[in-house]
């Protein structure tokens, strides 16, 4: 496992080491080796802050084991010629890598665009763009590349690209870049848990160029991979098994155009044969061993694997429920080699989430026939309860609104009354002053007459 890590793209290499350490992978010596590898990646590119540096240092310091080259972890430094060739591959310089390792994806894209102006290979640039979008978890942009590929692969565009190619470039390299972009599209769907899209797109892309796709699936990765070959093949197998109905497995494995693919993706062909023969216990042993071991340790795929793992078991439970109106949890547990409690919990969740016509009574799973009318009545009852709840909430809101309006009206009425009282008092005061003034004028007139 450890000796394979250098095949990854440095960003995935770094994240995988951190993921393994966080998940308590391996014994003390293996963890120390991982910590040392992480520090080597950090030191490979100076001038950036790694968020995992303390994690790597702790793994090394916690171990008293001596880490030697014999352990299979001799990683050359940045000055190593072979490693320099890896980092320079596809116009990736130290500055771009520092931005990627620091999570500064927009800055990395800007530098990548600057480099691409000197590169006449649009598909190489598109391939690097897809990688950065996956690093930044912008899967929608990755999936939109399918439309860009369709435009770029039109006849007139292909002719122009062929004319622009430098002597060192060839059509085979371009085709490999195109196929890798398509595989990144499939990977983005799997990461999102969209297994049907992952599977259907892969077979579509495979039929479009089986020769180049087979070359990628059988060639050794070059130290710039997002997924190792076992991870890529297992992802294809898992998405196929989860998304395609069981009654279509026989038809799928019989397609002549896919014969070479099934020979190469051996884990898929073995799984299909076991499922077609209803050897579920043997299949689940394979599922819980090879599938689990490969995908659970993969930094990009481990979270979506957890969902796929549950869905596949649900499909097998459904198969048994279709065959029998009555069966027991203990029978399924023994037949499938799964713990009793796990089977019971999964079956209960399946019946509830899928609204199946089954009920669980202790150990017994029984079919309970329900008419369309019963289902309709239950739906109407649920809707009625929901409507009544909404009406009750609305009544409470209306009552509060009435109280608020009544309070406001009362306050307004009291304010008006106070205002009228104040006006009346003021008018009376004005009248009294006028009377006094009038009386004063009369007295002055009387005094005038007496004087005369």
Curated annotation (Swiss-Prot):
InterPro entries noted in UniProt: PCI_dom
Keyword flag Phosphoprotein: no
Keyword Phosphoprotein appears in the UniProt entry: no
Record keywords: Cytoplasm, Nucleus, Signalosome
Top-rank taxon: Eukaryota
Location in or out of the cell: Cytoplasm; Nucleus
Annotated PCI domain residues: 205-374
Major subcellular site: cytoplasm
GO cellular component, one term: cytoplasm
Function statement: Component of the COP9 signalosome (CSN) complex that acts as an regulator of the ubiquitin (Ubl) conjugation pathway by mediating the deneddylation of the cullin subunit of SCF-type E3 ubiquitin-protein ligase complexes The CSN complex is involved in the regulation of the mating pheromone response. PCI8 may also be involved in transcriptional and translational control.
Subunit structure comment from the entry: Component of a COP9 signalosome-like (CSN) complex.
Name of the protein this chain belongs to: COP9 signalosome complex subunit 11
Source organism of the structure: Candida glabrata (strain ATCC 2001 / BCRC 20586 / JCM 3761 / NBRC 0622 / NRRL Y-65 / CBS 138)
Encoding gene (name): PCI8
